[in-house]
């Protein structure tokens, strides 16, 4: 019997962009939502997100339940505007992408958005209904540049289509880690997380 995740044939993994310093915590507790981090009292967590964006996300209600900060978020494609921002504002040796099994889509309390969840036009729905609005050609496009500003903004938002998982993404769904450099790979290897680590320059715009 096929599962919901099987219908997402264009997706191999889902992705979480993170800081290497968070990996020990992540592989102990899972990828936690902002509010779950607070509840667990985890304070030594390096937050990559823009504070202004997070303030906006904190007030956005998810139709199914709660607010965006109640959900751990994943991207359908990690080679996106957030990644582009991070590589231009942070040491690339400190960045990683955690590849998450798409079977996470089969769990309850999972929501998919057709674009950055913090944008006004974002559509939210359960995985079984989300294929109707996902624009995979835009999500997986190599570029979101366009001479017409409003189209560029639309493409940029769609590149950041999200999968939202209530509270946390369990450790057993974390499949492998991607990094940009040999140095980053060696630093992750020292953590002994027992998952494959690979260098993927393309996902980091290298």
PLM regions: where:
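Active-site-proximal loop/hinge segments that shape catalytic or ion-binding/gating pockets
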Residues: 1-206
